[in-house]
């Protein structure tokens, strides 16, 4: 599928990682109306995200699976879910959490439980959903497509954005029915590709 195939109206758009780049671009292009589960976390492995989806988020953010890594700023603690290989950069604030005690855990868990419930409801009720993932292999995405096909009642599309050494937007020919895969320049990917994202998302709207 090419970029033309993902155009149109959607009931919901979700980022599936790997960082917050997708969420920032959705926000900048007025396509973000709520927070998703993977919006503000680090999820470096789509393989682990696939397991998370397949398990329908069972044991996600389970306290016994969390490892406190370090302070990453004056305000934030980095905490890692070692089962799903997901890092929380922005959720555990230093006014309530330390290197030895997550005093704000209950509040964070409640927030993510709400996001999970909304995500699963959208999968059941939406007519059309768009998922966007940065950094993924063909094999991982083929597995993702199969997992989502078993979870979603109606139609969906997946946009994969891999950052490589290309110097312009490149569409890839992946033989997956619901997937559009592209490559964007890796150099300064947080700021230098805004015009590409604007073009990619220009003909996508939320109902």
Which residues does each PLM region occupy?
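Extracellular glycan-modifying ectodomains
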Residues: 1-207
């Amino acid at each position: 599928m090419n970029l033309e195939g993902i155009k149109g109206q959607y009931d919901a758009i979700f980022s599936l990682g790997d960082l917050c780049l997708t969420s920032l671009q959705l926000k900048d292009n007025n396509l973000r109306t709520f927070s998703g589960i993977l919006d503000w976390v680090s999820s470096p492995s789509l393989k682990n995200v696939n397991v998370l989806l397949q398990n329908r988020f069972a044991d996600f953010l389970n306290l016994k699976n969390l490892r406190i890594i370090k302070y990453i700023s004056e305000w934030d603690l980095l905490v890692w879910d070692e089962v799903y290989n997901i890092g929380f950069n922005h959720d555990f604030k230093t006014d309530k959490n330390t290197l030895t005690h997550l005093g704000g855990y209950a509040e964070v868990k409640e927030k993510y439980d709400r996001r999970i419930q909304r995500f699963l409801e959208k999968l059941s009720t939406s007519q059309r959903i768009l998922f966007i993932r940065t950094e993924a292999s063909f094999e991982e995405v083929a597995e993702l497509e199969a997992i989502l096909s078993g979870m979603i009642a109606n139609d969906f599309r997946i946009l994969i954005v891999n950052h490589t050494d290309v110097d312009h937007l490149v569409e890839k020919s992946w033989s997956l029915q619901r997937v559009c895969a592209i490559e964007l320049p890796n150099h300064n990917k947080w700021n230098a590709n805004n015009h590409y994202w604007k073009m990619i998302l220009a003909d996508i709207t939320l109902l």
